[in-house]
Amino acid sequence: MPTLRLRVDGLPIDVPAGSMVSAAVAIAGASKFRTSVTGQPRAPLCGMGICFECRVTIDGRAHCKSCQIPCEAGMEVETDA
Amino acid sequence: MPDTVSNVVSNATFDVAVIGAGPAGLAAAARAAESGARVAMVDDNPRPGGQIWRASRTPEPWLRSQVEVFSGARVFAAPEPGVLALERSHSNLELRYRSLILATGARERFLPFPGWTLPNVMGAGGLQALAKSGLPINGKRIVVAGSGPLLLAVAKYLRGHGADVRLIAEQADSSAIFRFGLGLIAKPGKLIQAAQFRAGLLGIRYLTACWPIAARGVERLESVTLQRNGKTWTEPCDYLACGFGLIPNVELPALFGCRMSETGVAVDDYQQTSVAAIYCAGEVTGIGGLDLALVEGEIAGYAAAGKPRDAGKLFAARKSNRQFAGALERAFAPRAELRNLPQDDTFVCRCEDVTYARVRQCSNWREAKLHTRCGMGPCQGRVCGGALEFLLGWKPDSVRPPVLPARVGSLARPG
């Protein structure tokens, strides 16, 4: 299966083509996608764009819903922004 | 880096615009296009198929080349009758239509319990969606919990992809499910599906009258505590996949002023809502499963394209599928004890971290929003709304645009 490489918090990650950014973040080993308003670690709940818990920064763009965005080669993903 | 967002006004007017590219939306678009209508289909996911057909080739029989598909696009407002405002990642679009079919589907009902905000506690459909999106689950220990037939489908999928499904905890009583099972005898197709499911689930513990009362872990989930027959025990696991049935996504129909029924959006025989030229099909009219969604979509598609006679030929098929939906709802209704799940310090609103103690001091949604910010975060009450409807009997407040967070630039219309 063809793979592509992107970076999650600076770490190079290879994912199968067609993977969502949420999967890449999980593969990178990050359990925390974002920090809640009281400082709790949070990660995806609904997997379908409803809950907004999967928000990360992609190529400098904040609040991207990682469950709904396909990975692209060379993407720079930052968690916990 | 600031984004360059272009505002585009589409010159074309579509005969039929379909919102949602799940089974109901695909069936509606296909039938409308076959009837000669110019059809646009809008969906916020990268590909058509909805949740049930995510990352699969199954939608293909329903995909019609004549349908113009706008993927990765969210409807955030309806600035004037016959116009939809869409936001895409780098551009906005105004789309004009004569008839509108809303097939916005359903989401899982989440109920708050201690620890439910920990990473790796997810919806049942949520974990399945993530696995389909590339999350590796091979060898992961997973507890599947909550309610409804979705739990079985999810457990089967997860196991089929190498996960160690420790058990399925179904909150409904076995007697209710048994009665539901008897009802299936009238539907041979459903019975065959049930038998196929059993084969894929062989050896997985299926515990009825069982539900999670707490998830534990430090940085992420480490174990879940379950309750059954007054006994509690703890299961170590990597993921908890937990959803208490489905609830319809009625926000967009509500924005258009469509009247609601007991189960979702109210529709007539032709799937038309209380608003002229606006139709609803699929789970948004009431949870009924794939077969009902398809036939409702077909009816709406024919009707919106001006073919009421073709629509009428499908009324009988819809009726039998609706009976199945009713039986399903009765069998898996959430039990009253689940109202005791959240503790005082359990967050009900995950966007604004509002505890159950604070929300419970309020007497209605409006007061809770004003005093606690519950439901005021990015999800706009889509997660806590379903919970509070069950926990406190609160009906959702009115919907105002933007129906989802939108870029500031999207709110300023050109010209």
What is the meaning of each model-derived region?
Chain B
Residues 11-24, 140-145:
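Beta1/beta-strand and adjacent pyrophosphate-binding region of the FAD-binding site
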Residues 16-38, 154-158:
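N-terminal Rossmann-like FAD-binding beta1-loop-alpha1 element of flavoenzymes
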Residues 34-51, 166-175:
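Glycine-rich FAD pyrophosphate-binding loop
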Residues 62-88, 95, 161-251, 261:
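A Rossmann-like FAD-binding core segment of flavoenzymes
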Residues 106-143, 147-154, 262-269:
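Glycine-rich dinucleotide-binding loop and its adjacent helix/turn
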Residues 122-131, 239-288:
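FAD-site-proximal beta/loop scaffold in flavoenzymes
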Residues 272, 302-341:
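Active-site-proximal substrate-binding core of FAD-dependent oxidoreductases
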Residues 281-316:
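A conserved FAD-binding loop/helix module that cradles the flavin
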